[in-house]
Swiss-Prot record:
Expressed by the venom gland. Its main location: secreted. GO terms for cellular component: extracellular region. Residues 1-10, 34-46 have a biased composition (Low complexity). Belongs to the non-disulfide-bridged peptide (NDBP) superfamily. It comes from Tityus stigmurus. This is Pape peptide.
Length: 46
């Protein structure tokens, strides 16, 4: 089964797809999340 998959998918198509997807997704998500969270506790004590 592995030999058939490798022979049918010898093109560089499936490689560039999964690479650029997981990179820009996890970066902007966690960064923009902690920002608004810190602003909440600051305005609370005031």
């Amino acid at each position: 089964k592995q030999l058939l998959k490798e022979a049918l998918a010898p093109e560089p198509a499936p490689k560039p797809a999964p690479e650029p997807a997981p990179e820009p997704a996890p970066e902007p998500a966690p960064e923009a999340a902690p920002e608004p969270a810190a602003a909440a506790p600051e305005a609370a004590p005031e």
